[in-house]
Amino acid sequence: MRITVFSDTHTRHNLITNDLPGGDLLLCAGDIMNSGYNKDDIISFCEWFSNVKGYNDKFFIAGNHCRYFENYPEEVKGILKEYPLIDYLQDEEVVLYFDGPNGEHTEDNIHIYGSPWQPEFYSWAFNLPKNGIELAGKWEAIPDNTDILITHGPAFGTLDTVIGRPWDGLGCELLADRIEIVKPKIHVCGHIHSGYGYEFKNGTHFFNASVLDERYEYTQKPMTFDWDKETNEITFL
């Protein structure tokens, strides 16, 4: 399975089009907006995302800059109905089924879960008190059989530091604890732009897929890789 991951385009999604080679899955880990107040930013992203060529399935979540998603969820649902080729996940699971030779569903399916929340971060969207009961509840909702987890923020201690402060992890401790239990094969996040990169530990492939750097310049490319679910091995393109 060929997967491309990206995050934090902040309305500059058109910049990355030529770095999307096509494949099975295209995953976005949030912050498609900038101020978060302009619904035209949502429409612009959805138009673009829908028209990206060469992918079988496309999923995205919101992030802390996506205030409109949190403040006007019903209006956002109405917007998203106009774009049936893409799927938005907010504390939701989707299962990709693969058919056998006679059209029957096989056991070779993939469970994907997406959630936009993070520990309180200034006055942005999808904030919950750090290490609080509500945030713990969001992560407890991640199904135990999740293969691919998409969250906006990173887990504590993994791809979560800012330039000049490598000792000061900004990721979520409760999310890290839940990942240790669920052990998803892939975790995709963004949020901390300078945390961009890849790590593999304890059986999970971690991707911080932020494409804009700290100056909001496009210097960090989407990551595309081939993934074998059975062996959990990946090969970067």
List where the protein language model places each region.
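Binuclear metal-dependent phosphoesterase catalytic core
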Residues: 94-101, 106, 177-182, 186, ...
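Core catalytic region of metal-dependent phosphoesterases/phosphodiesterases
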Residues: 6, 11-102, 181
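Active-site-proximal beta-strand elements of phosphoester/diester hydrolases
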Residues: 1-10, 29, 108-118, 147-152, ...
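Binuclear metal-dependent hydrolase catalytic cores centered on His/Asp/Glu-rich metal-binding motifs
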Residues: 107-148, 166-173
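Catalytic metal-binding/acid-base residues of hydrolase active sites
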Residues: 10, 32-33, 64-67, 93, ...
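Active-site-proximal segments of metal-dependent phosphoesterases and phosphodiesterases across multiple
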Residues: 33, 38-41, 47, 121, ...
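Short, electropositive alpha-helical surface patch
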Residues: 76-86, 169-171, 200-213
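Short hydrophobic/charged patches on amphipathic alpha-helices used for structural packing
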Residues: 15-17, 140, 176
